[in-house]
Protein backbone atom coordinates (compact mmCIF):
# COMPACT_ATOMS: atom_id res chain seq x y z
CA UNK A 1 0.00 0.00 0.00
CA UNK A 2 1.25 3.47 -0.92
CA UNK A 3 0.59 5.22 2.41
CA UNK A 4 1.05 8.71 1.01
CA UNK A 5 -1.48 8.15 -1.75
CA UNK A 6 -3.88 6.28 0.56
CA UNK A 7 -3.93 9.04 3.18
CA UNK A 8 -4.20 11.77 0.56
CA UNK A 9 -7.26 10.00 -0.86
CA UNK A 10 -8.82 9.79 2.62
CA UNK A 11 -8.16 13.49 3.11
CA UNK A 12 -9.63 14.46 -0.25
CA UNK A 13 -12.78 12.45 0.39
CA UNK A 14 -13.11 13.84 3.92
CA UNK A 15 -12.81 17.42 2.66
CA UNK A 16 -15.55 16.79 0.10
CA UNK A 17 -17.78 15.16 2.74
CA UNK A 18 -17.19 18.03 5.18
CA UNK A 19 -19.06 20.41 2.88
CA UNK A 20 -22.14 18.20 2.95
CA UNK A 21 -21.86 17.80 6.72
CA UNK A 22 -21.68 21.55 7.25
CA UNK A 23 -25.14 21.95 5.70
CA UNK A 24 -26.65 18.76 7.14
CA UNK A 25 -29.82 19.20 9.16
CA UNK A 26 -30.01 18.37 12.84
CA UNK A 27 -32.63 15.74 12.02
CA UNK A 28 -30.31 13.99 9.56
CA UNK A 29 -27.38 13.99 11.99
CA UNK A 30 -29.54 12.63 14.80
CA UNK A 31 -30.98 9.99 12.48
CA UNK A 32 -27.46 8.84 11.63
CA UNK A 33 -26.52 8.60 15.30
CA UNK A 34 -29.65 6.59 16.08
CA UNK A 35 -29.03 4.29 13.11
CA UNK A 36 -25.49 3.56 14.32
CA UNK A 37 -26.81 2.85 17.82
CA UNK A 38 -29.36 0.39 16.46
CA UNK A 39 -26.72 -1.25 14.26
CA UNK A 40 -24.45 -1.83 17.28
CA UNK A 41 -27.34 -3.43 19.16
CA UNK A 42 -28.13 -5.60 16.14
CA UNK A 43 -24.55 -6.68 15.44
CA UNK A 44 -23.26 -6.89 19.01
CA UNK A 45 -22.04 -10.46 18.61
CA UNK A 46 -20.19 -9.73 15.37
CA UNK A 47 -18.49 -6.78 17.04
CA UNK A 48 -17.46 -8.94 20.00
CA UNK A 49 -16.12 -11.60 17.62
CA UNK A 50 -13.97 -9.06 15.77
CA UNK A 51 -12.79 -7.66 19.09
CA UNK A 52 -11.98 -11.14 20.39
CA UNK A 53 -9.54 -11.59 17.50
CA UNK A 54 -7.84 -8.31 18.41
CA UNK A 55 -7.68 -9.34 22.06
CA UNK A 56 -6.22 -12.74 21.18
CA UNK A 57 -3.42 -11.11 19.18
CA UNK A 58 -2.76 -8.66 22.02
CA UNK A 59 -2.43 -11.56 24.48
CA UNK A 60 -0.03 -13.32 22.10
CA UNK A 61 2.12 -10.17 22.13
CA UNK A 62 2.20 -10.30 25.92
CA UNK A 63 0.43 -6.98 26.45
CA UNK A 64 -0.52 -6.30 30.06
CA UNK A 65 -3.90 -6.74 31.72
CA UNK A 66 -4.65 -3.01 31.84
CA UNK A 67 -4.11 -2.76 28.08
CA UNK A 68 -6.30 -5.80 27.44
CA UNK A 69 -9.02 -4.26 29.59
CA UNK A 70 -9.00 -1.04 27.55
CA UNK A 71 -9.08 -3.03 24.32
CA UNK A 72 -11.94 -5.37 25.25
CA UNK A 73 -15.49 -4.72 24.04
CA UNK A 74 -17.71 -6.25 26.69
CA UNK A 75 -21.50 -6.14 26.69
CA UNK A 76 -21.23 -3.24 29.12
CA UNK A 77 -18.86 -1.38 26.80
CA UNK A 78 -21.19 -1.85 23.85
CA UNK A 79 -24.17 -0.66 25.89
CA UNK A 80 -22.17 2.40 26.90
CA UNK A 81 -21.46 3.11 23.23
CA UNK A 82 -25.16 2.91 22.40
CA UNK A 83 -26.08 5.15 25.32
CA UNK A 84 -23.38 7.61 24.29
CA UNK A 85 -24.67 7.83 20.72
CA UNK A 86 -28.21 8.52 21.92
CA UNK A 87 -26.96 11.03 24.45
CA UNK A 88 -25.10 12.97 21.76
CA UNK A 89 -28.22 12.86 19.58
CA UNK A 90 -30.15 14.46 22.44
CA UNK A 91 -27.73 17.37 22.77
CA UNK A 92 -28.58 20.75 21.29
CA UNK A 93 -27.07 21.25 17.85
CA UNK A 94 -24.68 24.23 18.03
CA UNK A 95 -24.31 24.62 14.26
CA UNK A 96 -25.94 27.71 12.78
CA UNK A 97 -26.51 29.48 16.09
CA UNK A 98 -26.09 33.24 15.80
CA UNK A 99 -25.07 35.04 18.97
CA UNK A 100 -23.85 38.47 20.09
CA UNK A 101 -26.09 40.13 17.49
CA UNK A 102 -25.72 43.91 17.75
CA UNK A 103 -27.07 46.89 15.84
CA UNK A 104 -24.40 49.29 14.60
CA UNK A 105 -24.86 53.03 13.98
CA UNK A 106 -24.44 52.37 10.26
CA UNK A 107 -27.68 50.35 10.25
CA UNK A 108 -26.11 46.91 9.92
CA UNK A 109 -26.40 44.07 12.43
CA UNK A 110 -23.24 42.16 13.32
CA UNK A 111 -23.22 38.77 15.00
CA UNK A 112 -21.30 35.51 15.18
CA UNK A 113 -22.45 32.19 13.73
CA UNK A 114 -21.21 28.85 15.03
CA UNK A 115 -19.87 26.64 12.23
CA UNK A 116 -17.98 23.31 11.99
CA UNK A 117 -14.19 23.24 11.98
CA UNK A 118 -14.22 21.09 8.82
CA UNK A 119 -12.11 17.91 8.87
CA UNK A 120 -10.88 16.59 12.22
CA UNK A 121 -8.19 13.93 12.51
CA UNK A 122 -8.45 11.83 15.67
CA UNK A 123 -5.38 9.82 16.68
CA UNK A 124 -5.85 7.45 19.59
CA UNK A 125 -4.55 4.25 21.07
CA UNK A 126 -6.28 0.91 21.40
CA UNK A 127 -9.65 1.92 22.86
CA UNK A 128 -12.35 0.93 20.35
CA UNK A 129 -14.93 2.97 22.27
CA UNK A 130 -13.14 6.14 21.13
CA UNK A 131 -14.06 5.24 17.55
CA UNK A 132 -17.73 5.69 18.41
CA UNK A 133 -17.29 8.57 20.85
CA UNK A 134 -15.22 10.62 18.41
CA UNK A 135 -17.37 9.80 15.40
CA UNK A 136 -20.53 10.81 17.28
CA UNK A 137 -19.21 14.18 18.42
CA UNK A 138 -17.69 15.04 15.04
CA UNK A 139 -20.87 14.01 13.25
CA UNK A 140 -23.19 16.02 15.53
CA UNK A 141 -20.96 19.10 15.24
CA UNK A 142 -21.12 18.92 11.44
CA UNK A 143 -17.52 17.87 10.88
CA UNK A 144 -15.98 15.11 8.81
CA UNK A 145 -13.41 13.00 10.61
CA UNK A 146 -10.52 10.67 9.89
CA UNK A 147 -9.99 8.20 12.75
CA UNK A 148 -6.64 6.53 13.30
CA UNK A 149 -6.89 4.04 16.15
CA UNK A 150 -4.25 1.81 17.65
CA UNK A 151 -2.89 -1.07 15.60
CA UNK A 152 -4.07 -3.60 18.19
CA UNK A 153 -7.72 -2.65 17.56
CA UNK A 154 -7.75 -2.83 13.76
CA UNK A 155 -10.49 -5.45 13.42
CA UNK A 156 -12.67 -3.86 16.10
CA UNK A 157 -12.38 -0.44 14.49
CA UNK A 158 -13.06 -1.81 11.02
CA UNK A 159 -16.25 -3.49 12.26
CA UNK A 160 -17.39 -0.29 13.96
CA UNK A 161 -16.52 1.78 10.89
CA UNK A 162 -18.77 -0.43 8.77
CA UNK A 163 -21.72 0.26 11.08
CA UNK A 164 -21.00 3.99 11.15
CA UNK A 165 -21.00 4.02 7.35
CA UNK A 166 -24.36 2.23 7.32
CA UNK A 167 -25.80 4.80 9.71
CA UNK A 168 -24.59 7.73 7.63
CA UNK A 169 -25.98 6.20 4.44
CA UNK A 170 -29.35 5.49 6.08
CA UNK A 171 -29.61 9.17 7.06
CA UNK A 172 -28.67 10.41 3.59
CA UNK A 173 -25.25 11.66 4.70
CA UNK A 174 -21.92 10.89 2.97
CA UNK A 175 -20.20 7.76 4.24
CA UNK A 176 -16.87 9.55 3.82
CA UNK A 177 -17.86 11.85 6.69
CA UNK A 178 -16.35 9.25 9.04
CA UNK A 179 -13.37 7.27 7.77
CA UNK A 180 -11.20 4.88 9.76
CA UNK A 181 -7.57 4.44 8.70
CA UNK A 182 -7.29 0.77 7.75
CA UNK A 183 -3.55 0.31 8.23
CA UNK A 184 -1.26 -0.11 11.22
CA UNK A 185 1.62 1.60 9.41
CA UNK A 186 2.94 4.45 11.57
CA UNK A 187 3.61 6.44 8.42
CA UNK A 188 -0.15 6.99 8.20
CA UNK A 189 0.02 9.13 11.35
CA UNK A 190 2.94 11.09 9.95
CA UNK A 191 0.97 11.87 6.81
CA UNK A 192 -2.28 12.69 8.62
CA UNK A 193 -0.67 15.31 10.86
CA UNK A 194 0.89 17.15 7.92
CA UNK A 195 -2.07 17.24 5.46
CA UNK A 196 -2.87 20.91 5.98
CA UNK A 197 -4.81 21.10 2.73
CA UNK A 198 -7.29 18.46 3.88
CA UNK A 199 -7.25 18.37 7.69
CA UNK A 200 -8.17 21.38 9.85
CA UNK A 201 -7.31 20.09 13.31
CA UNK A 202 -5.84 17.02 15.00
CA UNK A 203 -7.15 15.69 18.32
CA UNK A 204 -4.73 13.16 19.84
CA UNK A 205 -5.87 10.89 22.66
CA UNK A 206 -3.03 8.82 23.99
CA UNK A 207 0.07 8.58 26.09
CA UNK A 208 2.80 11.14 26.57
CA UNK A 209 5.11 9.63 23.93
CA UNK A 210 2.39 9.94 21.27
CA UNK A 211 1.63 13.56 22.17
CA UNK A 212 5.33 14.48 22.23
CA UNK A 213 5.79 12.99 18.77
CA UNK A 214 2.85 14.95 17.40
CA UNK A 215 4.02 18.20 19.00
CA UNK A 216 7.37 17.78 17.23
CA UNK A 217 6.06 16.64 13.85
CA UNK A 218 2.55 18.02 13.27
CA UNK A 219 1.86 20.84 10.85
CA UNK A 220 -1.90 20.68 11.40
CA UNK A 221 -3.09 22.54 14.55
CA UNK A 222 -3.90 20.35 17.54
CA UNK A 223 -6.34 20.28 20.44
CA UNK A 224 -4.37 18.41 23.09
CA UNK A 225 -2.85 18.15 26.51
CA UNK A 226 0.52 16.62 27.30
CA UNK A 227 0.37 16.04 31.06
CA UNK A 228 -2.15 16.13 33.86
CA UNK A 229 -0.04 17.31 36.78
CA UNK A 230 -2.96 18.40 38.95
CA UNK A 231 -2.69 20.02 42.38
CA UNK A 232 -4.90 20.49 45.41
CA UNK A 233 -3.91 23.29 47.78
CA UNK A 234 -5.39 23.11 51.29
CA UNK A 235 -5.45 26.61 52.74
CA UNK A 236 -5.10 27.29 56.47
CA UNK A 237 -8.70 28.53 56.39
CA UNK A 238 -10.02 25.26 54.99
CA UNK A 239 -12.81 23.20 56.49
CA UNK A 240 -11.03 20.03 57.60
CA UNK A 241 -13.86 17.66 56.66
CA UNK A 242 -14.11 19.18 53.19
CA UNK A 243 -10.35 18.98 52.77
CA UNK A 244 -10.27 15.28 53.66
CA UNK A 245 -13.08 14.49 51.22
CA UNK A 246 -11.58 16.51 48.36
CA UNK A 247 -8.04 15.19 48.86
CA UNK A 248 -9.22 11.59 49.13
CA UNK A 249 -11.37 11.74 46.01
CA UNK A 250 -8.89 13.75 43.94
CA UNK A 251 -6.21 11.10 44.46
CA UNK A 252 -7.90 7.75 45.01
CA UNK A 253 -11.11 7.87 42.94
CA UNK A 254 -9.12 6.69 39.89
CA UNK A 255 -5.36 6.69 39.63
CA UNK A 256 -4.87 6.51 35.88
CA UNK A 257 -6.72 9.63 34.72
CA UNK A 258 -5.39 13.00 33.64
CA UNK A 259 -7.49 14.87 36.22
CA UNK A 260 -6.18 12.92 39.22
CA UNK A 261 -4.25 14.93 41.83
CA UNK A 262 -0.50 14.26 41.67
CA UNK A 263 0.75 16.93 44.12
CA UNK A 264 -0.82 18.01 47.41
CA UNK A 265 0.12 21.43 48.77
CA UNK A 266 -0.73 22.10 52.42
CA UNK A 267 -0.55 25.45 54.20
CA UNK A 268 1.82 25.29 57.16
CA UNK A 269 -0.91 26.59 59.48
CA UNK A 270 -3.14 23.54 58.92
CA UNK A 271 -0.55 20.82 58.25
CA UNK A 272 -0.56 19.47 61.81
CA UNK A 273 -4.35 19.02 61.73
CA UNK A 274 -4.76 17.75 58.17
CA UNK A 275 -1.77 15.56 57.42
CA UNK A 276 -2.10 12.92 60.19
CA UNK A 277 -5.67 11.81 59.33
CA UNK A 278 -5.10 12.26 55.61
CA UNK A 279 -1.80 10.37 55.74
CA UNK A 280 -3.48 7.45 57.52
CA UNK A 281 -6.25 7.45 54.92
CA UNK A 282 -3.69 7.26 52.11
CA UNK A 283 -1.69 4.61 53.96
CA UNK A 284 -4.79 2.45 54.30
CA UNK A 285 -5.34 2.77 50.54
CA UNK A 286 -1.68 1.92 49.86
CA UNK A 287 -0.78 5.29 48.35
CA UNK A 288 2.97 5.92 48.36
CA UNK A 289 3.72 9.32 49.93
CA UNK A 290 6.67 11.33 48.65
CA UNK A 291 7.11 14.17 51.11
CA UNK A 292 9.20 17.25 51.82
CA UNK A 293 10.93 17.73 55.18
CA UNK A 294 8.05 19.64 56.78
CA UNK A 295 5.45 17.06 55.76
CA UNK A 296 7.74 14.23 56.89
CA UNK A 297 8.07 15.76 60.36
CA UNK A 298 4.29 15.96 60.84
CA UNK A 299 3.51 12.54 59.36
CA UNK A 300 6.31 10.70 61.14
CA UNK A 301 5.27 12.23 64.46
CA UNK A 302 1.75 10.86 63.81
CA UNK A 303 3.14 7.40 63.09
CA UNK A 304 2.33 7.51 59.37
CA UNK A 305 4.74 5.62 57.14
CA UNK A 306 6.54 4.51 55.14
CA UNK A 307 7.54 7.87 53.68
CA UNK A 308 9.77 8.64 50.69
CA UNK A 309 11.76 11.85 50.36
CA UNK A 310 10.39 13.93 47.51
CA UNK A 311 12.74 14.98 44.69
CA UNK A 312 12.66 17.85 42.21
CA UNK A 313 11.59 15.38 39.53
CA UNK A 314 8.48 14.45 41.52
CA UNK A 315 7.05 17.96 41.13
CA UNK A 316 7.20 17.45 37.35
CA UNK A 317 5.73 13.93 37.34
CA UNK A 318 2.29 12.67 36.32
CA UNK A 319 2.28 9.37 38.19
CA UNK A 320 -1.01 7.86 36.98
CA UNK A 321 -0.50 5.54 39.94
CA UNK A 322 -1.06 5.37 43.73
CA UNK A 323 1.80 7.81 44.36
CA UNK A 324 1.41 11.34 45.75
CA UNK A 325 3.90 14.17 46.25
CA UNK A 326 3.24 16.35 49.31
CA UNK A 327 4.66 19.78 50.10
CA UNK A 328 4.00 22.13 53.01
CA UNK A 329 3.91 25.75 51.84
CA UNK A 330 3.82 29.08 53.65
CA UNK A 331 0.48 30.12 52.20
CA UNK A 332 -1.51 31.07 49.12
CA UNK A 333 1.26 32.99 47.36
CA UNK A 334 3.65 30.06 47.60
CA UNK A 335 0.95 27.62 46.45
CA UNK A 336 0.09 29.67 43.37
CA UNK A 337 3.78 30.10 42.54
CA UNK A 338 4.39 26.34 42.82
CA UNK A 339 1.37 25.43 40.69
CA UNK A 340 2.16 27.91 37.92
CA UNK A 341 5.81 26.78 37.88
CA UNK A 342 5.41 23.00 38.04
CA UNK A 343 1.84 22.40 36.87
CA UNK A 344 0.69 21.38 33.41
CA UNK A 345 -2.11 23.98 33.21
CA UNK A 346 -4.70 21.22 33.36
CA UNK A 347 -6.75 21.25 36.61
CA UNK A 348 -5.98 22.62 40.06
CA UNK A 349 -8.08 23.14 43.19
CA UNK A 350 -8.08 25.09 46.44
CA UNK A 351 -9.84 24.09 49.65
CA UNK A 352 -10.67 27.19 51.70
CA UNK A 353 -13.51 28.99 53.44
CA UNK A 354 -11.96 32.38 52.63
CA UNK A 355 -13.82 33.94 49.67
CA UNK A 356 -11.09 36.43 48.79
CA UNK A 357 -8.43 33.73 48.72
CA UNK A 358 -10.64 31.50 46.61
CA UNK A 359 -11.17 34.29 44.08
CA UNK A 360 -7.44 35.00 43.96
CA UNK A 361 -6.76 31.33 43.28
CA UNK A 362 -9.34 31.28 40.47
CA UNK A 363 -7.85 34.39 38.86
CA UNK A 364 -4.16 33.67 39.26
CA UNK A 365 -3.76 29.93 38.71
CA UNK A 366 -3.02 29.51 35.01
CA UNK A 367 -4.94 26.30 34.30
CA UNK A 368 -7.76 25.19 32.03
CA UNK A 369 -9.97 24.20 34.99
CA UNK A 370 -9.66 25.79 38.44
CA UNK A 371 -11.81 24.66 41.35
CA UNK A 372 -12.82 25.74 44.84
CA UNK A 373 -13.73 23.10 47.45
CA UNK A 374 -14.17 20.41 44.80
CA UNK A 375 -12.15 17.44 43.56
CA UNK A 376 -10.03 17.77 40.43
CA UNK A 377 -11.81 14.64 39.19
CA UNK A 378 -14.74 16.87 38.17
CA UNK A 379 -12.71 18.16 35.19
CA UNK A 380 -14.71 16.12 32.71
CA UNK A 381 -17.08 16.95 29.89
CA UNK A 382 -19.96 14.95 31.34
CA UNK A 383 -19.51 16.44 34.81
CA UNK A 384 -19.36 19.95 33.30
CA UNK A 385 -22.67 19.40 31.53
CA UNK A 386 -21.18 19.21 28.04
CA UNK A 387 -22.86 15.83 27.52
CA UNK A 388 -19.71 14.26 26.16
CA UNK A 389 -16.13 15.22 25.43
CA UNK A 390 -13.58 14.42 22.77
CA UNK A 391 -10.69 15.21 25.08
CA UNK A 392 -9.23 17.87 27.33
CA UNK A 393 -7.06 20.76 26.17
CA UNK A 394 -4.63 22.68 28.33
CA UNK A 395 -3.70 25.01 25.49
CA UNK A 396 -4.94 28.60 25.49
CA UNK A 397 -6.03 29.00 21.89
CA UNK A 398 -9.39 27.80 20.57
CA UNK A 399 -10.64 25.19 23.07
CA UNK A 400 -9.50 25.02 26.70
CA UNK A 401 -10.52 22.42 29.26
CA UNK A 402 -12.95 19.59 28.42
CA UNK A 403 -13.78 19.76 24.70
CA UNK A 404 -17.39 19.01 23.79
CA UNK A 405 -19.50 19.89 20.76
CA UNK A 406 -18.80 23.63 20.89
CA UNK A 407 -15.06 22.93 21.06
CA UNK A 408 -15.35 21.27 17.65
CA UNK A 409 -16.81 24.42 16.12
CA UNK A 410 -15.63 27.90 15.27
CA UNK A 411 -17.27 31.31 15.01
CA UNK A 412 -17.58 33.40 11.89
CA UNK A 413 -18.90 36.93 11.73
CA UNK A 414 -22.19 37.49 9.93
CA UNK A 415 -23.48 40.89 8.86
CA UNK A 416 -27.16 41.62 8.15
CA UNK A 417 -27.90 44.77 6.22
CA UNK A 418 -30.52 46.60 4.21
CA UNK A 419 -28.40 47.84 1.33
CA UNK A 420 -26.04 49.97 3.45
CA UNK A 421 -22.67 51.16 2.16
CA UNK A 422 -19.79 52.27 4.34
CA UNK A 423 -19.51 56.05 4.64
UniProtKB/Swiss-Prot annotation:
Keyword Phosphoprotein: no
EC number(s) given by UniProt: 1.2.1.41
Keyword Cytoplasm: yes
Function: Catalyzes the NADPH-dependent reduction of L-glutamate 5-phosphate into L-glutamate 5-semialdehyde and phosphate. The product spontaneously undergoes cyclization to form 1-pyrroline-5-carboxylate.
Alphabetized HAMAP family for the sequence: ProA (MF_00412)
NCBIfam families reported in the protein's UniProt record: PRK00197.1, proA
Family: Belongs to the gamma-glutamyl phosphate reductase family.
Protein name stated in the entry: Gamma-glutamyl phosphate reductase
Species annotation: Burkholderia cenocepacia (strain HI2424)
Gene: proA
Amino acid sequence: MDIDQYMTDLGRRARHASRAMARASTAAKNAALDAVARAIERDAQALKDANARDVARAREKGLDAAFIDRLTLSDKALNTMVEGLRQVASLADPIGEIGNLKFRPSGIQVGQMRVPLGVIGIIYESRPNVTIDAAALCLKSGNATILRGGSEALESNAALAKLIGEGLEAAGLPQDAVQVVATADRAAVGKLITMTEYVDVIVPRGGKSLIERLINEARVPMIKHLDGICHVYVDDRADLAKALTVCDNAKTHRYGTCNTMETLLVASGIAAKLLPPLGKLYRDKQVELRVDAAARAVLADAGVGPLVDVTEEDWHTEYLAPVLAIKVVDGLDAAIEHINHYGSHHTDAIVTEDHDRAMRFLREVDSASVMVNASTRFADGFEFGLGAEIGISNDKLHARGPVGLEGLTSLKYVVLGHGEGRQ
